[in-house]
Amino acid sequence: MRRVAIAVAAIALGIFVLLPAAEGDARAGPAMRVDREIARLLRLDLPVRCGGLRSRYVALTFDDGPGPYSQLALRILARAHAHATFFLVGKELRYWPRIPRRELRLAALGDHTWTHRDLLALPSSAIRRELVATRAAIEQATGVRVRLFRPPYGATDSGIGRVAAHLGMVEVLWSIDSRDSEGASWSAIGAEVARQIRGGSIVLLHENRGQTIRALRYLILPLLRARHLITVSLPQLLALDPPSRAQLRAGYAGCQV
């Protein structure tokens, strides 16, 4: 029973661990489900923007950390028993080295490049260096394999996705932009999420903005509870409500069906 609980916790937090199969696939199932879905998405080599839209699960994702608001965001998520995913900028880990391990208690972690440059302006070799350096820093800080990648500004093309896929990372975008990076007020952030949220949504937020953290506490998490939506990490969303091939090929339109 204890091993089953460990497996469930692993999928919830995005920890990619396989239990020994000798005691049966039922016990290894949750982590295996994540690995199978990651492998499928890597073969398809298309950006993920949402889940399959067939569940009550939603994924809150936070870019550009770690930073001064990271601890507060974690406390707010913990009080609400909520899960999330943090896409980390490699160079920031030098200033906040302990944050990634703390984030793992409630969240999955992803690669958001080392310098947060527009990858469309870089050659493939430089893109690879950005991703490899950040992945190595996160894995050194946590001991956990990084399998998710998000390009800064959402600026991407098939070549960028191919570099990430060759490194074993699934490219993840979003279906809801909270507009917090544009300077939206905390009330406007909450209103934007409220207008679009549904089961299967992937929400773009930023953990280095005070107005975002306030919106998370006072508007977004209460809204999700009121609508009976459940926050999960991205690996859990992908395993429990995976997007179809047709959705992936349709891009953003595939999240509006």
What are these regions (language model features)?
Residues 62-64, 87-91, 113-114, 150-154, ...:
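Active-site-proximal beta-strand/loop segments in catalytic clefts of secreted hydrolases
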Residues 1-8:
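N-terminal Sec-pathway targeting helices
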Residues 222-257:
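Low-complexity, Gly/Ser/Thr/Pro-rich intrinsically disordered linker/tail segments
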Residues 197-235:
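Catalytic grooves of carbohydrate-active enzymes
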Residues 29-146, 230, 239:
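Active-site beta->alpha N-cap acidic-glycine motif
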Residues 71, 75, 101, 125, ...:
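Solvent-exposed, polar/charged alpha-helical surfaces in well-ordered, non-transmembrane soluble domains
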Residues 155-197, 229-241:
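His/Asp/Glu-enriched short active-site or ligand-binding loop at hydrolase and phosphoryl-transfer sites
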Residues 15-32:
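C-terminal region of N-terminal signal peptides and the immediate post-cleavage residues
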